[in-house]
Amino acid sequence: MDRIKIIGGNELRGTIPISGAKNAALPLMIAALLTDETLILDNVPRLADVALLQRILGNHGVDIMAAGKRPGDHEYQGQTLHISAKTIVDTTAPYDLVSKMRASFWVIAPLVARMHEAKVSLPGGCAIGTRPVDLLIMALEKLGAEITIDGGYVIAKAPGGLKGATIAFPKVTVSGTHVAVMAAALAKGTTIIDNAACEPEIVDVADCLNKMGAKITGAGTPRITIEGVAKLHGARHTVLPDRIETGTYAMAVAMAGGEVQLSGARPELLQAALDVLTQAGATITVNNDGIKVARNGAGISPVTVTTAPFPGFPTDLQAQLMALMTRAKGASHITETIFENRFMHVQELARFGAKISLDGETATIDGVERLRGAPVMATDLRASVSLVIAALAAEGETMVNRIYHLDRGFERLEEKLSACGANIERISG
């Protein structure tokens, strides 16, 4: 199993190109199931999760062709996928595939919308009553789908097609909003989604669906209106840049020191995180090519942050910020309001010598003068990259194990950091 070795102490200087957003690319690929024509997606990141979703879509009979780089593309230019769901041969998504990635459950929406039936395995590890899929099922039922759960599978049927409805989510849900928008695009009549998620990735998917002939307004606000259409057609769409990758590398620069241009980044996608970084002592400069992040000489200042849905501070940057705050001059406080059990990285950060205490959903980080390299283990995607950030400023060698988590969400992370001067390498085997 691959590992990443890091010897800390080097500043970061150079340019890091920002990849396409995983959290937009996955639902965009799934949306291709809504039409029998070809959807062309540009700037799709090369990630393990994208490759897995290609397998899942292939199971339904979807043909996917990955085009090579075009003249003038930079080294990390995202791939172009030509996705054709001309014929759907199977409306069942089996457990062995869905269990590996929760987002793959979303195929239920376009399948029941277009084929009027779907059988999709519950994602792995879902306890009855606290399942994240409950809100997704509620949305489909509001649109007229008949839902049964049998043998670990959700079976959705809509013999006469889906019908527009008002869907009021009891809490903001990104996955629920994606599912509701995709399903409603082909429903008969008007659908109104209240308390919709406002994330940029929701807007990106809605923009693509509108290019395909959907009639969606209000994406990016808490109320989305969808006028259903009978058929969607093919289109070409460029995946927006990854705001979580942008924030991650910005925090890496703030941790290690130096100055890095984040090429292609869009500051409006993560303003709350950039404001926190400025408060922590980083210098953020917006320019025509993206964002320049610098920390030259100044120490790291402590911050108090609460995660929140967009446009608040994203939960997907919480672990990275915690790593940065381990070196702050004073006590920082981070409260997690979006997900339970999202402090699994605390135990591993402690192996560097970090001082972190937990009280419910709030972590208090007492900054230390130095971190020391250590063997550490990645527990999930965002936690894994927080360990890399800590290692960049730690004395000595750090070995990060179980980096398959990293490969799910960060495209060639070690190459991008190495190009800016980090002493980092992937060790195979």
Swiss-Prot record:
InterPro entries: Enolpyruvate_Tfrase_dom, Enolpyruvate_Tfrase_sf, MurA_subfamily, RNA3'P_cycl/enolpyr_Trfase_a/b, UDP_GlcNAc_COvinyl_MurA. It catalyses: phosphoenolpyruvate + UDP-N-acetyl-alpha-D-glucosamine = UDP-N-acetyl-3-O-(1-carboxyvinyl)-alpha-D-glucosamine + phosphate. SUPFAM superfamilies: EPT/RTPC-like. Phosphoenolpyruvate binds at residues 22-23. UDP-N-acetyl-alpha-D-glucosamine binds at residues 102, 131-135, 316, 338. It is found in: Cytoplasm. Its main location: cytoplasm. One of its GO terms (molecular function) is UDP-N-acetylglucosamine 1-carboxyvinyltransferase activity. Pathway: Cell wall biogenesis; peptidoglycan biosynthesis. Its EC number is 2.5.1.7. The modification 2-(S-cysteinyl)pyruvic acid O-phosphothioketal is found at residue 126. Keywords: Cell cycle, Cell division, Cell shape, Cell wall biogenesis/degradation, Cytoplasm, Peptidoglycan synthesis, Pyruvate, Transferase. It is an enzyme of class 2 (transferase). The active site is at 126 (proton donor). GO terms for biological process: cell division; cell wall organization; peptidoglycan biosynthetic process; regulation of cell shape; UDP-N-acetylgalactosamine biosynthetic process. GO terms for cellular component: cytoplasm. The keyword Electron transport does not apply. It holds the Pfam family EPSP_synthase. Belongs to the EPSP synthase family. MurA subfamily. Cell wall formation. Adds enolpyruvyl to UDP-N-acetylglucosamine. This is UDP-N-acetylglucosamine 1-carboxyvinyltransferase. It comes from Rhodopseudomonas palustris (strain TIE-1). The lineage of its organism: Bacteria, Pseudomonadati, Pseudomonadota, Alphaproteobacteria, Hyphomicrobiales. The gene is murA.
